[in-house]
Amino acid sequence: MDFINQTLFSKYTESNVDTIPYLLGLILALTNGSRILRFINSFIIICKHIVTTSKSAIDKMRKINNSEHNTKNAHEEYEEVMKQIREMRIHMTALFNSLHDDNVKWRMSESIRREKKHEMKMSDNRNEFKHSHNDTNICEKSGLETEVCL
């Protein structure tokens, strides 16, 4: 009876139904306890306990490895993000330097263009003044009779 209780009410923690011990327990009850069936049933129970123990040990190891892996993952992700930030900082610096250089070149070209335009206006004004000054007679324009005009 003790053997049947062990078989039918085994400590299988995973709450899965294992049919082999139940069938062997039923056959054992019907055959009045053969030694071979007892040995086979006890062997199966021992194997089942070993499997459940190893499963729980493997699960614990997986949890430990996952936590270490997650920690490593967090550090790796942090390093990756920092690397990307450094790369972006380099790219942004290069972009701003390029924009600054372009802006400086544009300002220089604008100032040169304005200066040339101003010089052209000044030279045009001088030329116009020279032409108008050479063509006109002061005496005729002023209407005054001066010693120079007489």
Curated annotation (Swiss-Prot):
<keyword id="KW-0406">Ion transport</keyword>
<keyword id="KW-0260">Enterotoxin</keyword>
<keyword id="KW-0472">Membrane</keyword>
<dbReference type="GO" id="GO:0039520">
    <property type="term" value="P:symbiont-mediated activation of host autophagy"/>
</dbReference>
<feature type="topological domain" description="Cytoplasmic">
    <location>
        <begin position="45"/>
        <end position="150"/>
    </location>
</feature>
<comment type="subunit">
    <text>Homotetramer. Interacts with the immature particle in the viroplasm. Interacts with host CAV1, early and late in infection. Interacts with host integrin ITGA1/ITGB1 heterodimer. Interacts with host integrin ITGA2/ITGB1 heterodimer. Interaction with microtubules blocks trafficking to the Golgi apparatus.</text>
</comment>
<dbReference type="InterPro" id="IPR002107">
    <property type="entry name" value="Rotavirus_NSP4"/>
</dbReference>
<keyword id="KW-0964">Secreted</keyword>
<feature type="topological domain" description="Lumenal">
    <location>
        <begin position="1"/>
        <end position="15"/>
    </location>
</feature>
<keyword id="KW-0843">Virulence</keyword>
<keyword id="KW-0735">Signal-anchor</keyword>
<keyword id="KW-0325">Glycoprotein</keyword>
<dbReference type="GO" id="GO:0090729">
    <property type="term" value="F:toxin activity"/>
</dbReference>
<keyword id="KW-0407">Ion channel</keyword>
<comment type="function">
    <text>Plays an essential role in the virus replication cycle by acting as a viroporin. Creates a pore in the host endoplasmic reticulum and as a consequence releases Ca(2+) in the cytoplasm of infected cell. In turn, high levels of cytoplasmic calcium trigger membrane trafficking and transport of viral ER-associated proteins to viroplasms, sites of viral genome replication and immature particle assembly.</text>
</comment>
<keyword id="KW-1182">Viral ion channel</keyword>
<keyword id="KW-0800">Toxin</keyword>
<keyword id="KW-0945">Host-virus interaction</keyword>
<keyword id="KW-1072">Activation of host autophagy by virus</keyword>
<keyword id="KW-1133">Transmembrane helix</keyword>
<dbReference type="GO" id="GO:0016032">
    <property type="term" value="P:viral process"/>
</dbReference>
<dbReference type="GO" id="GO:0005576">
    <property type="term" value="C:extracellular region"/>
</dbReference>
<feature type="glycosylation site" description="N-linked (GlcNAc...) asparagine; by host">
    <location>
        <position position="5"/>
    </location>
</feature>
<dbReference type="GO" id="GO:0015267">
    <property type="term" value="F:channel activity"/>
</dbReference>
<comment type="similarity">
    <text>Belongs to the rotavirus NSP4 family.</text>
</comment>
<dbReference type="GO" id="GO:0034220">
    <property type="term" value="P:monoatomic ion transmembrane transport"/>
</dbReference>
<comment type="function">
    <text>The secreted form acts as an enterotoxin that causes phospholipase C-dependent elevation of the intracellular calcium concentration in host intestinal mucosa cells. Increased concentration of intracellular calcium disrupts the cytoskeleton and the tight junctions, raising the paracellular permeability. Potentiates chloride ion secretion through a calcium ion-dependent signaling pathway, inducing age-dependent diarrhea.</text>
</comment>
<feature type="transmembrane region" description="Helical; Signal-anchor for type III membrane protein">
    <location>
        <begin position="16"/>
        <end position="44"/>
    </location>
</feature>
<dbReference type="GO" id="GO:0044155">
    <property type="term" value="C:host caveola"/>
</dbReference>
<dbReference type="GO" id="GO:0016020">
    <property type="term" value="C:membrane"/>
</dbReference>
<protein>
    <recommendedName>
        <fullName>Non-structural glycoprotein 4</fullName>
    </recommendedName>
</protein>
<keyword id="KW-1038">Host endoplasmic reticulum</keyword>
<keyword id="KW-1043">Host membrane</keyword>
<keyword id="KW-0812">Transmembrane</keyword>
<keyword id="KW-0813">Transport</keyword>
<dbReference type="GO" id="GO:0044169">
    <property type="term" value="C:host cell rough endoplasmic reticulum membrane"/>
</dbReference>
